[in-house]
């Protein structure tokens, strides 16, 4: 779906402000490509050393802000293919069940990383790019993608939002 949206974007749509504060649609697409690159070949991309996922996302986007839309689209095409292959390899035992820290997102079995990427894409396409490009906001709802997204949220929220969840509701 992302490749189809990216292929359909006009120059003005690539430059439009996205739903991610301070990022254009092109920056969101670059982030999506960079995430796949980080999974497939982490040694080839600088994401800083903050240990914070949001700060790590900004590093490659900032470094590539002057790229053309064609370069961003080509990077997404290349790295999404390699990233999906790497994620598929993480679904096989014993690797699938290996528990590792994922920056400030918590400690998770490697197989759930694919769910995190589905969540990331679901949100970025429909909400962030969708804020500027209506056809992205109305992409069909894929039950498998929704299942993977909810599974990631249920696995991640207790770790990512432990303080907020521990505080309980406001009285």
Regions found by a protein language model. Name each.
Residues 1-30, 40:
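An N-terminal domain-cap segment
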Residues 20, 71, 75-79, 113-117:
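Short, contiguous, pocket-lining structural segments
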Residues 4, 41, 74, 78, ...:
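Charged/polar, solvent-exposed surface patches and flexible loops
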Residues 27-38, 82, 121-124, 128, ...:
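Alpha-helical scaffold segments in carbohydrate-active enzymes
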Residues 24-25, 68, 109-110:
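Short, structural beta-strand-to-alpha-helix junction motif
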Residues 35-89, 93-98:
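Short, helix-capping/interhelical loops that line the mouth of catalytic, cofactor-
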Residues 5, 35, 86, 124, ...:
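Short alpha-helical functional segments enriched in proximate histidine and acidic residues
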Residues 16, 44-50, 89-171:
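Structured surface interface patches that mediate subunit assembly and partner/cofactor docking
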């Amino acid at each position: 779906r992302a490749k189809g949206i990216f292929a359909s974007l006009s120059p003005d749509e690539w430059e439009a402000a996205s739903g991610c504060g301070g990022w254009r649609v092109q920056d969101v697409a670059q982030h999506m490509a960079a995430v796949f690159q980080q999974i497939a070949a982490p040694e080839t991309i600088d994401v800083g050393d903050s240990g914070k996922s949001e700060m790590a996302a900004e590093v490659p986007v900032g470094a590539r802000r002057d790229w053309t839309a064609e370069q961003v689209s080509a990077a997404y095409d290349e790295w999404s293919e390699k990233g999906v292959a790497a994620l598929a390899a993480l679904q096989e035992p014993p690797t699938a069940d290996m528990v590792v820290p994922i920056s400030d997102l918590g400690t998770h079995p490697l197989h759930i990383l694919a769910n995190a990427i589905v969540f990331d894409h679901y949100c970025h396409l429909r909400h962030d790019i969708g804020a500027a490009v209506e056809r992205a906001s109305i992409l069909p709802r894929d039950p498998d993608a929704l299942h993977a997204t909810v599974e990631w949220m249920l696995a991640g929220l207790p770790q990512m939002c432990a303080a907020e969840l521990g505080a309980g509701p406001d009285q």
